[in-house]
Amino acid sequence: MPELPEVEVISNFLLDKIKNKQISNVIVNNWNLRAPITKNIDDMLKGKVIRNIKRRGKYTIWNTDGSVAVIIHLGMSGKLIYADHDQMRNKHDHVVFLFSDNTSIIFNDPRRFGLVIVLNKEQETDFFSDFGIEPLTDEFSGDYLQELLKNKKVNIKSALMDNKSIVGVGNIYASESLFRARISPLRSAKNLTYRECEKLAAEIKNTLSDAIAAGGSTLKDYAQPSGSAGYFQNNFYVYGKVQKPCKICNNIITLIRQNGRSTYFCNACQN
């Protein structure tokens, strides 16, 4: 699943390519994703101009001049593809946004866990109302993290992946950030010291920023709208490295399951 860095890379690409473009048509080839695509999406968006593109958590948001926004989540396997109008369509191209300059954005999603909806400003505010803090903001700090975690009765990795507390830190970047901070994913969240919270907050920011600079992580499905792969996976310390030596100490990387998700860590470096 694309996480915060991948969606940030996608949103930045789209901001450069489709800001101030007018939507001429929206073609829906499959209405049934994880939730139905907004009815009358073509009528709602036809003639609208894209004024801004931003990210919230793992969602990319296209604000238009018509007080409505397109909200897209890529699910497990979704992609947004930048193409000309006449590019040959593929089997899983569920939604095609056509622009007046003969370019298009194609939403392709083989597993159909993605989301494409249109909301007005009030609906957009309500939709994101229970989302947690953005980890790349100045407000996200050691002080904030310690206050957030002090009553959490879960392990630290699960706490980091709670979207109502912190958005966008998915499985990959939780594992990598905890390694960089030298904190075991098995630790109780509420027992982290202030110094550990300070270190962890910094390493979450560093890990996410490094991943964005690398174009994200391409493991299976993710690609940038241009078709280019990300390469942050080449810099992983622990994720996907089960039974391989730790880059720091040569101890063998451990794989466990936490809340149904794979967790990778070095039990020598992380405590």
Swiss-Prot record:
Keywords: DNA damage, DNA repair, DNA-binding, Glycosidase, Hydrolase, Lyase, Metal-binding, Multifunctional enzyme, Zinc, Zinc-finger. It comes from the Bacteria. Involved in base excision repair of DNA damaged by oxidation or by mutagenic agents. Acts as a DNA glycosylase that recognizes and removes damaged bases. Has a preference for oxidized purines, such as 7,8-dihydro-8-oxoguanine (8-oxoG). Has AP (apurinic/apyrimidinic) lyase activity and introduces nicks in the DNA strand. Cleaves the DNA backbone by beta-delta elimination to generate a single-strand break at the site of the removed base with both 3'- and 5'-phosphates. InterPro entries: DNA_glyclase/AP_lyase_DNA-bd, DNA_glyclase_Znf_dom_DNA_BS, Formamido-pyr_DNA_Glyclase, FPG_cat, MutM-like_N-ter, Ribosomal_uS13-like_H2TH, Znf_DNA_glyclase/AP_lyase, Znf_FPG/IleRS. Its EC number is 3.2.2.23, 4.2.99.18. Gene3D superfamilies: 1.10.8.50, MutM-like, N-terminal (3.20.190.10). Belongs to the FPG family. Binds 1 zinc ion per subunit. The active site is at P2 (schiff-base intermediate with dna), E3 (proton donor), K58 (proton donor), R261 (proton donor). This is Formamidopyrimidine-DNA glycosylase. A zinc finger (FPG-type) spans 237-271. One of its GO terms (molecular function) is class I DNA-(apurinic or apyrimidinic site) endonuclease activity. HAMAP family: Fapy_DNA_glycosyl. DNA binds at H92, R111, K152. Its cofactor is Zn(2+).
